[in-house]
């Protein structure tokens, strides 16, 4: 029998907790046997004294097991269960293409996603822009769509990882969100509760990233790769660039449109293509669906070019309650804002740098993101045709197009966009879309 306060004392004093102590405490979080004050105290003790890798694995698996752990065996799936998770960014619409692409190559993708908060967009908010799409279906419907279509992108259900829900809300209010150990356990407990065979992790780097520096992003990526592999899920973490908007747009309906244009081949932003292919190829390799990277990329290009990935996206949308002709007629269904107008820079030259976080916050100001959980969204607003770093900018070249509902909102966003995109006389050095892969063999 353990005492919560003794576990807190041990961690406060910088000692390692045993697996049994961690399991006891996490069970107490779930059953309310541990108080809010005790959870906050442990969070702060971990923040200052950290956890070793064994502790991180124990915390992650205990939180995973605090609620329902999905079981796919009864469905008789004839391929691996694979997934991707991103630490979040601006214009990060990858999941919408990657899920159907991986499914078209023989994987099963039960993707449990989140809503946006702060400057980052949420995958679920994009799907909420599609009329009828159920982001919170019954578990029966979720399983049916995964089996029949190969991919279902939905929100976290109430019985999945309840310990994380309670722990996270307390961390959010007690300044302990930024602990690498606690971030690792929070992210992975949700993903591992889906009983994945393999996971590709997208850790963003740069001005629009969650972590403030490259070093912090790399530390998080290494922690996630080590803990996930240690918990028995084949995982690779990629460090990818978020020093500019990833897609050509940022918002909800506008990103859904870009995802469909990508899947159908109408338009593929080269940076978005590079990161999507890197992550998706890694999923196929880890899941045993490709012999090497060249094979994985060839398979992915094939399902893009023959329309199979776009077809699967359409089947997922209709399977979860959306329109059956959504891919073909998306413009009929997606909401449009009242004002759609370009914004121009005050100087000429090259797009030199971008405060990506500020561009994300401009979307929030327009009404396309949340200042606090529970805020209602306007799915029609956002930015499109956002310039890329290195683009030549003159008086006739917009740096972005703003989708707004009022002149006042447009003016606010225009000022924010102009401030966030820095124009210089010289072009910046080109940076890679993917900085590094952290595989199990690198740990």
Curated annotation (Swiss-Prot):
Q: Which InterPro entries match?
A: Glycosyl_Trfase_fam3 (IPR000312), Glycosyl_Trfase_fam3_N_dom (IPR017459), Glycosyl_Trfase_fam3_N_dom_sf (IPR036320), Nuc_phospho_transferase (IPR035902), PYNP-like_C_sf (IPR036566), PYNP_C (IPR013102), Pyrmidine_PPas_bac/euk (IPR018090), Pyrmidine_PPase_CS (IPR017872)
Q: In terms of domain of life, where is this protein from?
A: Bacteria
Q: So what does this thing catalyse? A: thymidine + phosphate = 2-deoxy-alpha-D-ribose 1-phosphate + thymine
Which keywords describe this protein according to UniProt?
Glycosyltransferase, Transferase
Pfam families membership: Glycos_trans_3N, Glycos_transf_3, PYNP_C
Keyword flag Transferase: yes
Under PROSITE patterns, the record lists: THYMID_PHOSPHORYLASE
Which GO biological process categories is it annotated with?
pyrimidine nucleobase metabolic process; thymidine metabolic process
GO MF terms here are:
1,4-alpha-oligoglucan phosphorylase activity; thymidine phosphorylase activity
Q: In which pathway does it act?
A: Pyrimidine metabolism; dTMP biosynthesis via salvage pathway; dTMP from thymine: step 1/2
Q: What is one term from the GO cellular component aspect held by the record? A: cytosol
The answer to keyword Transmembrane helix applying to this record is no
Q: What is its EC number?
A: 2.4.2.4
Please describe what this protein does: The enzymes which catalyze the reversible phosphorolysis of pyrimidine nucleosides are involved in the degradation of these compounds and in their utilization as carbon and energy sources, or in the rescue of pyrimidine bases for nucleotide synthesis.
Describe the family membership recorded for this protein in Swiss-Prot or TrEMBL.
Belongs to the thymidine/pyrimidine-nucleoside phosphorylase family.
Q: Which HAMAP family match?
A: Thymid_phosp
How is the subunit organization of this protein annotated in UniProt? Homodimer.
Q: Which protein are we looking at?
A: Thymidine phosphorylase
């Amino acid at each position: 029998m353990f005492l919560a306060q003794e576990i807190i004392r041990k961690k406060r004093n910088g000692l390692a907790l045993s697996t049994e102590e961690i399991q006891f405490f996490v069970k107490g979080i779930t059953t309310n046997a541990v108080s809010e004050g005790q959870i906050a105290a442990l969070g702060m003790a971990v923040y200052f004294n950290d956890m070793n890798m064994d502790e991180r694995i124990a915390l992650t698996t205990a939180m995973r097991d605090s609620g329902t752990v999905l079981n796919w065996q009864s469905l008789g799936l004839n391929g691996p269960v694979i997934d991707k998770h991103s630490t979040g960014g601006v214009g990060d619409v990858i999941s919408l293409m990657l899920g159907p692409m991986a499914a078209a190559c023989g994987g099963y993708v039960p993707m449990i996603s989140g809503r946006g908060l702060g400057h980052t967009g949420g995958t679920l908010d994009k799907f909420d822009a599609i009329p009828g799409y159920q982001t919170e279906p019954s578990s029966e419907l979720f399983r049916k769509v995964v089996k029949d279509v190969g991919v279902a992108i939905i929100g976290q259900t109430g019985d999945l990882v309840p310990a994380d829900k309670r722990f996270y809300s307390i961390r959010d209010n007690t300044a302990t969100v930024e602990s690498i150990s606690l971030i690792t356990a929070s992210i992975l407990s949700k993903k591992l509760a889906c009983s994945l065979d393999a996971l590709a992790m997208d850790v963003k780097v740069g001005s629009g990233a969650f972590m403030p520096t490259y070093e912090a992003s790399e530390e998080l990526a290494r922690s996630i790769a080590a803990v996930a592999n240690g918990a028995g899920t084949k995982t690779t973490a990629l460090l990818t660039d978020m020093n500019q908007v990833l897609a050509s747009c940022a918002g909800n309906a506008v990103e859904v449109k870009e995802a469909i244009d990508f899947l159908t081949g109408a338009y593929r932003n080269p940076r978005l293509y590079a990161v999507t292919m890197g992550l998706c190829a890694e999923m196929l390799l880890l899941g045993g669906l490709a012999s090497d990277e060249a094979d994985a990329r060839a398979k992915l290009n094939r399902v893009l070019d023959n329309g199979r990935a776009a077809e699967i996206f359409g089947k997922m949308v209709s399977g979860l309650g959306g329109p059956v002709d959504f891919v073909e007629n998306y413009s009929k269904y997606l909401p449009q804002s009242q004002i759609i107008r370009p914004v121009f820079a005050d100087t000429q030259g090259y797009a030199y740098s971008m405060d990506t976080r500020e561009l994300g916050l401009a979307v929030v100001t327009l009404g396309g993101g949340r200042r606090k959980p529970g805020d209602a969204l306007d799915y029609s607003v956002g930015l499109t045709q956002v310039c890329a770093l290195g683009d030549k900018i003159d008086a006739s070249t917009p740096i972005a197009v703003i989708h707004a509902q009022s002149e006042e909102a447009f003016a606010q966003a225009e000022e924010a966009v102009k401030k966030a995109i820095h124009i210089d006389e010289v072009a910046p050095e080109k940076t890679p879309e993917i900085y590094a892969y952290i595989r199990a063999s690198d740990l």
